[in-house]
């Protein structure tokens, strides 16, 4: 999300400004209902993997999480442990230069087995087999959020968080109203 950004024309004519600031939006969705269930707005110097625990903690502990689909930026021991702590299945592709982990935790052993499988079968086949394509639902939802505006009007960080939460509430309501309700009658 752009914050205190500048227009394309100004950037082309005068060059980029060096004090540009960005906010990163991290979301978690329910793949069945397509509702945004977890949201975190951070500054541009916070990595994706640092907020995974906060995102999962926004979902009540008594609600079951089946699987967590993420990109390779989340291929860390900490992220896999956070997912395992919620008794969920981690669907995270190993990084391109991934090496086996030496510890004997179950999440590390599972990741090492995944690494062997990807090397043996190939990344494309693993993505089809694992259902990794479901991660694109989040990318689609991010696109929908940006359709409501890719810039933040608020100046203070707290107000920006409120602005994002308002957009997400509107988008969740749109999603609820726009989803078809299918019933099969015998």
Residue ranges and their predicted role:
Residues 80, 111, 172-173:
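Short alpha-helix boundary/capping motifs
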Residues 8-10, 32, 55, 118, ...:
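Hydrophobic alpha-helical segments with strong N-terminal bias
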Residues 1-89, 93-95, 100-102, 106-107, ...:
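Polybasic low-complexity intrinsically disordered regions
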Residues 123-186:
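Basic, amphipathic alpha-helical segments enriched in Lys/Arg and hydrophobic/aromatic residues
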Residues 51, 113-114, 137, 165:
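Exposed alpha-helical structural elements
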Residues 104-119:
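Acidic, Ser/Thr-rich peripheral helices and adjacent loops at domain boundaries
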